[in-house]
Amino acid sequence: MDLSSLRPAKGAVKNKKRVGRGQGSGNGTTAGKGNKGQQARSGYKRPINEGGQIPVYRRLPKFGFTPIDRKSVTTVNLSQITRWIEQGLIENELGVIELKVLCHASNADYFKVLGNGEITAAVKITAHGFSKSAEAKITAAGGEAVTAVRTLEEAARVRDLAVEEALLKPKTKLVKRVKKNQKP
């Protein structure tokens, strides 16, 4: 076998359909486009127009909506955390910022730990959420599951605190200051 004997598979190469080359060819005159009108012309055709038939966007019902404040959640399984421990990337504590780095999630803001897999090392894990099974497995191994209150973006905006501390600090409600009327 050599390069000169290679051929494409049967049926893989088709001849180009040559249109507008005389009536005898079967595709002459109007070149298979019918008579006059928008669709006989070259260029743009309205993709929505279905020629009198109710178009698909009106045949199908409206469905659902997208909440504007939805948080995108990045999930991490216990099996992945165990792998990181075995590789020596984690020693005894795993914070939200380390999760962001280890997951290669540059725009992730909210992390949830799921209970798929087993964990044997006693590790303190800080994340925004834990499944019940993950929390049970972590505490059974002698570790600690700490729930972060703020997202990374919110924690970065807190003044006078490091990001790690701000993640755990509860949000305070704004208190409206009311001036008391002075008695005359």
Swiss-Prot record:
Protein name, entry field: Large ribosomal subunit protein uL15
Role of this protein: Binds to the 23S rRNA.
InterPro entries xrefs: Ribosomal_uL15, Ribosomal_uL15/eL18, Ribosomal_uL15/eL18_sf, Ribosomal_uL15_bac-type, Ribosomal_uL15_CS
Family: Belongs to the universal ribosomal protein uL15 family.
Region (Disordered) residue spans: 1-50
Keywords, comma-separated and alphabetical: Ribonucleoprotein, Ribosomal protein, RNA-binding, rRNA-binding
Complexes and interactors: Part of the 50S ribosomal subunit.
GO terms for MF: rRNA binding; structural constituent of ribosome
Domain of life: Bacteria
